Amino acid sequence: MKNTKQLNDALEHRILILDGAMGTMIQKYNLTEEDYHGEQFRDWAYPVKGNNDMLSITKPSVIDEIHRQYLEAGADIIETNTFSSTTIAMADYHMEDFVYQLNYESAKLARKACDDYTAKTPDKPRFVAGSIGPTNKTASLSPDVNDPGYRAITFDELRKAYKQQAEALLDGGADILLVETIFDTLNAKAALFAIDEIQEERGIRIPTMVSGTITDASGRTLSGQTAEAFLISVSHLDLLSIGFNCALGAKQLVPYLEAIAPQTHFRISAHPNAGLPNAFGQYDETPEQTAEQIKEYLDKGLINIIGGCCGTTPEHIKALSDLAKDYKPRKNT
């Protein structure tokens, strides 16, 4: 991986800024069903509005513009538009056969944007993180309360799907693979197993970020793990970072970051939501409010990589970038 040394050097010297939300940014464009179909899928027989990942193919200018807004705001790392780009998640749209193209084209878009900004300021290299979401199925829990032993997906089916996604992201130019929004650690382990297979087959080391989701005030993931248990579950791996994203706002994440910080030599990341959604599912937290809460992470030395999830905008990321400049990154234990 050609940019790994630059990435590690940057992490040694400063807190890196991850980008913010993709989905809520796309909503602002008010795209139509026709926009989603584009030219390639003009005659597609199924409705696809809401399948944001396909916009990397059908409306690349929209995705490129969002990437560049985040880079302009100060992001060091931008995520590919591939959160749902596995055969498992794409089955909802009957688009399993296009998964390689979705991931490859998304990574290429992000790569070009990053390279353009790195060329402007070579002392601040930008990096592409291939976004790998949890899929819409869980390997640990039954979807049927009347049949607790039933599973909608197997570990090997997940491994195969994740491997296809990861290979395409790497082929398209990703520097990092980000396994994120993990609600079921068994799903994540399938992704990490697939990444390890690729490392072995290609003879490379892939910087891998792992980011779990604490679903509510219970302090646990959906599959029942505490923050500490989640950390232990993946601590045998060689990870670039571990952390949390989504579900909660910045303030609510503090105790979980504090729980893992003394117990790991991994770098720590966080990309919380812009607070909690209101009654209409919208996020009201301003960039200033988010930054004020994130300041606690920095004051306590908890963080190496910081960004935003649902509801965050380039303005939120600029506020975080401006704030983080005055702080040193967390030192590994």
Residue ranges and their predicted role:
Residues M1-T333:
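Domain-level signal for soluble alpha/beta catalytic cores
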